[in-house]
């Protein structure tokens, strides 16, 4: 009833010997062909896909509203500056209404440099030196320049939907007459 443990390996070895024995074995009948040329080609694959419509969508000094896409890109060629944000696919879009400004700076936004950390020295006179990153920002007025020196000028504050205080201009004659009445 019970097989001896030594009988199982011998049966397996007999089957193995029958399958792979001699020149007419199964292993010698398998044909192997080595590729001398790539079957489908390599350099011409993947050209049927449409372009992804990348690039700058709004140029310098163009007016944009919040949510307007300014740059579509792969990777961070342009970095977000003042009043813009970057999406998960590196799309740069507007957060505030205003005019698009492209500029270069050696520090990441908000560009706050310390006195003990001077800017790059001996910058070569080329269009885009390596020390500088390209930034996109939005200025409120077309004449404004970016980057703003936020320490000297202060941070730009915008209050959306908040009613503006109306300051009444009182003529000087009315002030003098009111002072004369009280006296």
UniProtKB/Swiss-Prot annotation:
Report keywords, A-Z.
Answer: Mitochondrion, Ribonucleoprotein, Ribosomal protein, Transit peptide
Transit peptide keyword on record = yes
GO cellular component terms, alphabetically, are: mitochondrial large ribosomal subunit
Subcellular localization(s) per the UniProt record: Mitochondrion
Which GO terms of the molecular function aspect are on file?
Answer: structural constituent of ribosome
Q: Which GO terms describe its biological process?
A: translation
Q: Which SUPFAM superfamilies match?
A: Ribosomal L27 protein-like
Q: Where is the transit peptide?
A: 1-34
Under PROSITE patterns, the record lists: RIBOSOMAL_L27
Q: Does the keyword Ribosomal protein apply?
A: yes
Predominant cellular place of this UniProt entry's protein: mitochondrion
Q: Member of which family?
A: Belongs to the bacterial ribosomal protein bL27 family.
Its recorded name reads Large ribosomal subunit protein bL27m
Q: Which organism is it from?
A: Cryptococcus neoformans var. neoformans serotype D (strain JEC21 / ATCC MYA-565) (Filobasidiella neoformans)
